[in-house]
Structure formats: structure tokens, C-alpha cells
Amino acid sequence: MLLVEGNTSTQVKYLQHGLRMLCFNPKRLDGVFDTNTTLAVKRYQTSRGLTSDGKVGDGTWNKLKSDIIPLQTSLKNKGYYSGTIDGVAGDATYNALVKFQSDNGLTADGMAGQSTLDKLHTTDTNKPILQLGSTGKYVIELQTKLIKLGYSCGDTGADGVFGDD
């Protein structure tokens, strides 16, 4: 594979997604390999010790995929991504990152900067295990998320009581 300035394709869009997710912002995510995409590719290549020619051959593509896999894995572990862990920054991967950022009070810009990575790689160990009979703010948080996903929490909605509904 070889992607160069002037190309227009879905692969270019996925390249742009990947670059943006890794904080090498190509500005547009439209599948058009323009000057900004070339500059982002060069910055990425330089940072990874690759030949900085702005062209995306197998070496650059495979390195990009290997950098995306940990993000996909973390997003999948957090329940935001349900696709294949393949390193391709497709629409589902990119949208999962933006949704994760939005849900966690982060800037939803699709760039996995330090704040996003810190939040993505932490576990919520300070939250209690919820079970039938549990009450409180964590139950409300769970119920609210379930309702948002289209599930019913009984006639009372998010009432803070973990019941049969």
C-alpha cells in the first residue's frame, strides 16, 4: 500500500483518524490526503524514527496500526468499542474515543492526549460493587447510563435503589 498527497479514499480517512488520535492532527478527517495530512504524517514519522517523507507505505501504516491497538484495547475494555482489535482507526474506533472523552468530562476532540490516556488507563477502584439492595449515587449513575442506552429501570427511573427492575 502507498498513500500520498492527492489520494482520496477511506484508507486516507482512517489514516487521518489515526494521526489525530495520536495527537498528530491533520486538521481535516475527510479522506483527502492534503498538505496538512502530509505534514501530520511527517511529524508522526519523525517521532517514530521512520523516514520522514510524508508518504504512507507499509512501514508507516504498520507502525500506526501498532500505536492504535492499545487505544482500541482500552476502549474495548471500557465498553466503548466493540469492533475488532486490528489497529485500523476506522469510524467506530474514532467515535468510541470521542464518546469516551465526552462521557468522562474531557475535551471531546478525538486526540488521546495525556488527560485522556490517564483516564483511559485508570480503573474505578474507588467505586463499590453494586448488587441488589445497593443504594446511593453510584446506583443513580448506573441507572442513568442504562436509561441512556435504552434500558428500563422501572417506573421510578433513576431513583438510586438497585431493585428487581
Which residues fall in each region the model found?
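Cell-envelope/ECM-targeting effectors and their regulatory/trafficking segments
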Residues: M1-D165
